[in-house]
């Protein structure tokens, strides 16, 4: 039964490793606008400006907050369409892989193209919010979290962001106000952690201060990055506004909040179970100590009674030996008085001869009777003492057996509950991670599309500006050259043909320069597009390799979980069928005691040996 106390340990070490320090601050600063935009959107719809978002996340510690792991690009939403809640348990734990953070890769891509994306938190005209479509294949149950849509856990089939049940009057929906870095393994709750809810309340002030600092950083970045790009005309295009509105409408659904609440209840229940186990262990120790004290007192009383009986017997023997000569003299005198005087003379001689023999016979007879009575009395006392001891031992054994059966049943029930709690908590953790990963993947996909479109618009704008500037310079230069030619013609008096030829040559030179500039601009744009295509191809290839590796790790993890569950079920089945060695030992003890009761006691020494053996068996069973 002691094996059930280890069910709360982590099955795998990856889930409790500390988070990696790099790659979180940069992603927070770049994607901080998403938090502020989502907060403003959720507050405007809920009617309370920022109250629900801070109330929903005030208990999270800054080091224990859920930091979602990004989903790698290249995996279409249609592949997730056939998944359900039963597939969540097959998702692997945190992979120990070394690759560059996604924010660093985006920075490299922006640096190679020579442009950076425009911040997504600039104020734009918002489109009317889309009404969320309920999932047709998963009806909601009372007291349960809403099931995921058919396209995946929190991933719509259209590939766009929607407000997940925020407009439907859901009181648990809060805007996404977390860092969009990699998934932190320290954020996964487990049965092993026994932190009470008061510890989370203690760190609410830290979380609120961190939110205010992050919002200040977002506002400073927005004011700094929006100044040099305020003159852009293509940013007002409808497609860019749609992407921004979708990015700002990212919220965490009620499923995440219910998952967190359920995890907290599981933690409290596990702590309560541990306290009950400690109390039961203390009670068992006290019971063993009291049992030992009772046995010691019984043994002391038995020895005292035995000593008293021996002393009484010795006193009686001494009293009889001292009083026997006097009694014989008195009896002889009484006989002499009763005999007539005539007969006493001729009877004195045979009486004197027979008196020693009679005295010897009487003495032997008295001693035999006394020994017989003492032996009978001793046997009766021993039988009575043995009967009392057997009754006491049988009562103690019955009481202990009933208590042991009750505790064994309680331990078995607690073990089954622990197994169910661990399985449910692992499933909840997988669901929470899946939802958060999908949210981050959507945000990154929208950011990537927005950055690509912004860079393309900026390159087109630069190209058009350069072309206009070049044409203006060429026109001015042609005018100056024409003026110089006219002045030279007037001065030198050249003929009309020479002037026409010179003008034609100048026009051809100007056209040639224009063509060269145009070809150079087309070549640079074509090279940039080709470079972006190669970069996307490499990213897709890397994503495919990582996906294969993740599937392999997922299979290994599922096999490990199945094997652990199978071992636990076998253990519970053995205990329930009575194949446990402790239970067999409990069954053998009453049989041995019954055999000892049927067997007649040979002597007091054999009885003491049997009592010592029985006491040793009881002590071994107690420990």
Curated annotation (Swiss-Prot):
Annotated Pfam families: DUF4659
Biased composition annotated in UniProt, kind: Low complexity: 76-87, 184-197
Biased composition (Polar residues): 217-230
Keyword vocabulary terms for this entry: Coiled coil, Isopeptide bond, Ubl conjugation
Coiled-coil regions, chain positions: 266-295, 359-392, 431-501, 534-573
Crosslink feature (Glycyl lysine isopeptide (Lys-Gly) (interchain with G-Cter in SUMO2)) location: 528
Compositionally biased residues, Basic and acidic residues: 14-28, 344-376
Positions of region (Disordered): 1-241, 314-376, 574-607
Superkingdom of origin organism: Eukaryota
InterPro entries, per database record: DUF4659
UniProt name for this protein: Coiled-coil domain-containing protein 185
Organism: Homo sapiens (Human)
Underlying gene: CCDC185
